[in-house]
Every structure is written in C-alpha cells, then in structure tokens.
C-alpha cells in the first residue's frame, strides 16, 4: 500500500514539473520567440525541486486521485467529457512564486505576468509586415514609341496614351529601375531621344490632333486674378474643341503615311483600301471620332460605319450629321439599323501662303447589312511635296466621275446640298424634280477647271474627254477657245476610274424607303 502511495506522489511531482515546463513555453511564446525547439527541456534545479517537494507536503495520500482516462494514446490533454478534470474540481497547488489555481491556465499567458517593455525599446517602430500595413505596389509602364512615348506610373494614363495609336509598343515593369533600363536600351538602339518619366498628374494625353501629337505644347496653367475676386477651387473645364479649322500640309502627309503603312495590327476599328498612289480609310464602330474628323478634312475616307449613337461622326460638319440623323428618322424610320457613309472626295491643295482648296465631298448614305473588311497591308509610301498636285488631279478626276454617275441613277433622294458637299441616299421612287435640280446645280458649280481651287489644264482636259464621250461639249474660257488645253500624257493614262485597287470591300446595301423632302 505504501508503494502505491509513493508511486502516486512521484506521479504528482512529474505532473507539476510538466506544468512548469508548459508555463515556460507559454512565457517564451509571449516574449516573441517562435522557436520552441531551441527551448531546453531539462529538469528543475534542486532549489525548485525542494520547493515542489515542500508544496507536496500539504497533500495527504487520501487526496491523491488517479489520472483521468485520456481521449487517445499520446495526447497530453484529459477527456473533456469527464467532469473530474474541470478547474473547479482540482485542488490549488503551491509553486515557487505564488499560489496558482488551475483556472489560471485558462487566462491569457496562463496567468503568468508578462514583463513590460522598456521605454527605449518602445521607440523602435514595428515593421510594416508585422503591423499588418499593406505595401502599395506601383507598376511602371514604358511606351516605347508613338506621340506619347515615355515612362508612366499609372495604367490609366498608359492606356490613354496608347489607345487608338497604330503600331505603338508598350510593356509593364515592376520597378522604375527595370523600366528605365528597358527604355534606355530601346532609345539607344533606335538612336532617339531619351524617354522622360511622366507622372500621373503631368500626363498630357489628349492632343488637338493625331498629326500634331508630336509637337503638342505642354499644358499651360491658368493664371487667376485674385484681386477683388476669389480664386475658384478648380480650373474651369475647357469647352470641347476638336481640331484646327484648317488642315496643314504636314497633317495631310502624316495621315497619308499612316494609311500607307497601316497593316491592321493593333486597331480593329479601321482598315484601309489601297490603290497604287493612295490609301483610303474605312472606319468601323468605335473608331476614334477625332481621327475620323481629320481624315475627313484630308479627303482620305472611303467609308464610315458608325454606331447607333453616331459617336464616330460627332466631329463632322453639323449639316452632315443632321442629314444622317434625318435619314435614320425620316427615311428608314429606324435608329437601330446599321448604316454606312460612302464618301468620294478630293484632297486639299496648298500654296506658299497656306491652304488654297478644301476637299469637296459627295456622300451616299444607306443601310448596311453586312461588312466584310479585308486585310490591310502595309504599302510603300513614296509621295513627296511636289507629288501632291498630281495626286490632287487624280482624286479630282475620280470625284468628277462619281458626280456624273448620279445622272444614271433614276431613284435618288437628296438629303443635303451645300457649296462643297452633296449628301444623297437611294430611293424606291423616281427622283423628284427638286432633287434633280439640286444635283444639276451642284454639278455645274463644281465641275470645272477650277475644281481644285485653281485653273488646272489637266482637269479641263479630263472634263472635255468625259463630256464628249457622252455626246456633249465642253469649253473653258481660261483656255484659248477650248483648244489650248495641255495634252498631258499622265492625265490620259490609267483606267476609267483611276488606278486599279489592290483590294476591295465587300458589302451588301439595302435600299431605304422614301420620305418627304427635307428642307435644309
């Protein structure tokens, strides 16, 4: 019997030692130590053992109870379903420091007081990762080429700088060092100027025109007079300004080269129809309205397929937009149908003093059932400034042919006619006399040797040949009795409607219904 009591007492001592080891582990964890394996598990010193033995002296053999049944082999916790292990049923034990009760093990740090940190250690700020503060990550974007080339720190600015610009190249980097290295490597290989870093607030992403993008001046801040008036909290928003009133020769050459070099990559809102000397733009839905306006002013558009909200043509002349709206509401009586604008135009002509001649347009509006754009191919651009007059003559001849073909169409409705623009659509009824007179008046006004803003003998010669082929006569008072017209071999060369196109667009058009005559 005595041996059993000794064994039970020895077991109790071991349990107390185990509790002390657990208390040390909890204290080490509270002090920030995460390496439990480095904590040496050794027996208590003889002094602590004596304290334990002295504490056990208060227990009698009758107070010793057997260890409750465990839930599984190897587990150190008792069965939670047995009420005998609840803290209120266990007797207090005496440790070397204070009287501890089993309920202390349910408190934070098992009831062991944690020493306060000194003031010197409190001035050391915790790391961001330990304090839970999120590290903001900034990406950097290098726009290698284009009108807004540079290094950006904002994706919104980068997207605005590259959207709608054909052939632009850009890439994302994690650090400014990588972005700068990539930009310097590109500029060195291309032998161009070093790219600048453009912060978010300093990016100028909406130049007045595509052609002037490379030379757009930096944005000037408004200077406010503060004497007697309060400065507004923010600069007033500028009014919507689309383009300069006149297109320059540099603008035209920029758009001309853009059309010749466009291969269809990077922009699915347009494609080109390429001839031997010129490439014309075909704009689809969601095309950039500013580029549509500039190409219209340059006479370099063949077809426009606008969206239902007509956002692509919002910068075209107001009377042209109104004619399109009337066609949808009064002619076809449906604003949801897809339509097209087929344009035949001349190109501008310049002199040393500036712009001499603005393009003249004949525009056909109709309902487009199907558009199959062909693949755009990059063409060789060899045009020089001295070649612009020859190109203007060629487009002028094609314009005259398109205008004369209206005489063969018996069912036409004139939507709008102005000094240099005629807008018409097909009709299911015969052309009324009012529309016929409008077409004839427009033809008499523009079909002359002064079509391009100056007397051109080549244009006179072309008109003479075309009219005589139809059985008519033509004389020009600028030419000596109509016989001193320059017999230019280049004007006689080529097929009936200019150079043969290298590819064409396939489209099916529906004939719109009739409507009453619209008064402009």
From Swiss-Prot:
Tell me which Gene3D superfamilies the record gives: Ribonuclease H1, N-terminal domain (3.40.970.10)
The record's function comment reads: Enhances the ribosomal termination-reinitiation event leading to the translation of major open reading frames on the polycistronic viral RNAs.
**Which Pfam families would you find in this protein's record?**
Cauli_VI
Species for this entry: Cauliflower mosaic virus (strain CM-1841) (CaMV)
Q: Which UniProt keywords apply?
A: Host cytoplasm, Translation regulation
The segment annotated Disordered runs over 487-520
Instruction: Name the family the entry cites.
Output: Belongs to the caulimoviridae viroplasmin family.
An example GO biological process term is: viral translational termination-reinitiation
The miscellaneous remark of the record is: The inclusion bodies are the site of viral DNA synthesis, virion assembly and accumulation in the infected cell.
Q: Does the keyword Cytoplasm apply?
A: no
Record's protein name: Transactivator/viroplasmin protein
Question: One Gene Ontology cellular component annotation?
Answer: host cell cytoplasm
Q: Where in the cell is it found?
A: Host cytoplasm
């Amino acid at each position: 019997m005595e041996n059993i009591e000794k064994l039970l007492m020895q077991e109790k001592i071991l349990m107390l030692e185990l509790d002390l080891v657990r208390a040390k582990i909890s204290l080490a964890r509270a002090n920030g130590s995460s390496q439990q394996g480095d904590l040496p598990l050794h027996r208590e010193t003889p002094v602590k053992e004596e304290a334990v033995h002295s504490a056990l002296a208060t227990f009698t053999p009758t107070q010793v109870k057997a260890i409750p049944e465990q839930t599984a082999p190897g587990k150190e916790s008792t069965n939670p379903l047995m009420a005998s292990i609840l803290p209120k049923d266990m007797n207090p034990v005496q440790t070397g420091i204070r009287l501890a009760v089993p309920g202390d093990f349910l408190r934070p740090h098992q009831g062991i007081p944690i020493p306060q940190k000194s003031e010197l250690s409190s001035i050391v700020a915790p790391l961001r990762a330990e304090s839970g503060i999120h590290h903001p990550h900034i990406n950097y974007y290098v726009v290698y080429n284009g009108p807004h080339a540079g290094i950006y720190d904002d994706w919104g600015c980068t997207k605005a700088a590259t959207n709608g610009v054909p052939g632009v190249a850009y890439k994302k980097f994690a650090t400014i060092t990588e972005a700068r290295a990539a930009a310097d490597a590109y500029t060195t290989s291309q032998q161009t100027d070093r790219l600048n870093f453009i912060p978010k607030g300093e990016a100028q992403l909406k130049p007045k025109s595509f052609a002037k993008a490379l030379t757009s001046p930096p944005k000037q801040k408004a200077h406010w007079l503060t004497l007697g008036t309060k400065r507004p909290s923010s600069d007033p928003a500028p009014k919507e300004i689309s383009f300069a009133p006149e297109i320059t020769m540099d603008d035209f050459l920029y758009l001309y080269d853009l059309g010749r070099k466009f291969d269809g990559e990077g922009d699915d809102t347009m494609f080109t129809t390429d001839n031997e000397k010129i490439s014309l733009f075909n704009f689809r839905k969601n095309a950039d309205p500013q580029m549509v306006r500039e190409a219209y002013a340059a006479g370099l558009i063949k077809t426009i397929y606008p969206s239902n909200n007509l956002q692509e043509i919002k910068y075209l002349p107001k009377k042209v937009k109104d004619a399109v709206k009337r066609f949808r509401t009064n002619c076809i009586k449906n604003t949801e149908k897809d339509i097209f604008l087929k344009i035949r135009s001349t190109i501008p002509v310049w002199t040393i003093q500036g712009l001499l001649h603005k393009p003249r347009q004949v525009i056909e509006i109709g309902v487009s059932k199907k558009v199959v754009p062909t693949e755009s191919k990059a063409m060789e651009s060899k045009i020089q400034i001295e070649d612009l007059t020859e190109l203007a003559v060629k487009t002028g001849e094609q314009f005259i042919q398109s205008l004369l073909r209206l005489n063969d169409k018996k069912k036409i409705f004139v939507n709008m006619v102005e000094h240099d623009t005629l807008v018409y659509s097909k009709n299911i009824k015969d052309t009324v006399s009012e529309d016929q007179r409008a077409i004839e008046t427009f033809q008499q006004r523009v079909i002359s040797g002064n079509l391009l803003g100056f007397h051109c003998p080549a244009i006179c010669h072309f008109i003479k040949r075309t009219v005589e082929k139809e059985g008519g006569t033509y004389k020009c008072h600028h030419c000596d009795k109509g016989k001193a017209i320059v017999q230019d071999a280049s004007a006689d060369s080529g097929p009936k409607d200019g150079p043969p196109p290298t590819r064409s667009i396939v489209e099916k058009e529906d004939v719109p219904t009739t409507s009453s005559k619209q008064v402009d």
